[in-house]
Structure formats: structure tokens, C-alpha cells
């Protein structure tokens, strides 16, 4: 069994961060060591919440604790998502290096959550800069959305072709694999949900339905990053992992849309996470 150290947010109510990613990864047969960067009552897009940001020292101390009982070498991957403070970025990078020293084959997937004030996604000052200047260079895989793609590449990215160029730029900055979780308004079709996956071997594009919500569910990117990493650890090829992830997330979104509920319906869609009924295919475009 593969093991993922998942360092991201926790919400008591609803689905975001580790709450959105842990159960789906476990469904795929991967053990998840969840380390929470924050503990909030609910995700920040409600506009109000209670809770705490975990002290930055907690990350290193918890890693040390796992190491001291001789289990850290069993960690196959580190996944980072929503980060509670700029100082935590450094701690997460250090944690990955510690894991890597115990298991040289371990990989790091960075989901570079930078915040989106227009949508109510709020992150602490300095987190964006830390992700760009520190985490990206150490990540084997990075999973930006459109906002994060612009920040990581330093390009404006106003159309499909510029998105391709931005992905190519990121591949020169450290990551070996880039999964763009949502092309948003720079996609080819306004009525579709479109994604990219890129390596040195090329760029693949996948398109699936875009569901309409009164309020967009939160935690979709966390679910996407977790499923992609779990699929890779389970031995799927890059493209198999990309397709399974896109299809499983599509099915979760369809179930959620049909439910009329704001929060992701991960439990209700559990069978489709394991075996997606959707069968959208990735097409190589570069």
C-alpha cells in the first residue's frame, strides 16, 4: 500500500482541503497521513469562519515524530494544498526534503492554492510568494488553476495558446508534470470544463461538461490533486491518471449539481470515484 503525507487545510463542516482529498484517496487504496495546516469551522468562501492556523513548528515536529518511530521511510509522496501562513511554505519544503532523505523515491505534488478574493478564497500574506519562490522549484508535480497558472508562469494568459506557453514555462522552473485543473475563460469552449496535462513529452487536453451552480462548490481542486496523485502511485500512466481524475471529478460534480446542495457530495458519489461512469478522453495537442 502506498502512503501520502497530505499537508493542507481541514474543515469540520463541509469539504475542502484534506476533508475533500483524504477519503477519495483512501477509496483508491492509498493510505493518507493527513497533516492539517489550519483547522476551520468551514471553508473561507462562506465569508465567515472560526478556527486556527496551525503553528508553523507543528509541521516539522509532526514529521520528526513520525521519523522517530521509524515510519517516515514508508512515505511515498507529499501533497500540499491550502497553506495557512507564509512560514508554513518553508516548513512544507523542509518536510519534503526530510521525507526524501528517508525515501529517495518519494515525490512532491504541490497544489499551489493562492487565493481568489473574487470567489472568497482567502490565503495569508506571503503564501503566494512562497509558493512561487520556494515550493515550485521542489515540486515534481504542480496543479494550478488559471489564476495560479498566471502567477507561476509570470504570463498574462488571456487565451488558449498563451495557456500552452505558460505551461511550457512552468516546466522549465522545476516541476516535471503540470496539471492545469481548470482553464476557465481561456478554454476553447465557454460551455465546457477544460483541463491540461503537460510533461516534456507533450501537452494533453480534456474537456467535460461544465455544470451550473448558484454557488460554485469548493474543494474541487483539492479532490483533483489528490486523485491524480493517488492514481500515479497506484501505477497508472500519466494519461490514465489524468483521465481517471477528470472523469471521477466530473461524476462528483454531476452528483453534486443534481443534489442542489452547496458542498461537494463526495460520499454520495463514492462509487464513481472508484469507477467513474464518465469516459472522457485526453487528446494530445502539442
UniProtKB/Swiss-Prot annotation:
InterPro entries found in the cross-reference section: PM/HMP-P_kinase-1 (IPR013749), PyrdxlKinase (IPR004625), Pyridoxal_kinase_PdxY (IPR023685), Ribokinase-like (IPR029056)
Gene3D superfamilies: 3.40.1190.20
Cofactor(s) demanded: Mg(2+)
Keywords: ATP-binding, Kinase, Magnesium, Nucleotide-binding, Transferase
Binding residues for substrate: 9, 44-45, 222
Enzyme class: transferase
Signal peptide span: none
Listed Pfam families: Phos_pyr_kin
Pathway annotation from the record: Cofactor metabolism; pyridoxal 5'-phosphate salvage; pyridoxal 5'-phosphate from pyridoxal: step 1/1
EC annotation from Swiss-Prot or TrEMBL: 2.7.1.35
Catalytic activity: pyridoxal + ATP = pyridoxal 5'-phosphate + ADP + H(+)
Annotated GO MF terms: ATP binding; magnesium ion binding; pyridoxal kinase activity
Family the entry assigns: Belongs to the pyridoxine kinase family. PdxY subfamily.
Purpose of the protein: Pyridoxal kinase involved in the salvage pathway of pyridoxal 5'-phosphate (PLP). Catalyzes the phosphorylation of pyridoxal to PLP.
Assembly: Homodimer.
UniProt name for this protein: Pyridoxal kinase PdxY
Organism: Actinobacillus pleuropneumoniae serotype 7 (strain AP76)
UniProt lineage: Bacteria, Pseudomonadati, Pseudomonadota, Gammaproteobacteria, Pasteurellales
Gene name, Swiss-Prot/TrEMBL: pdxY
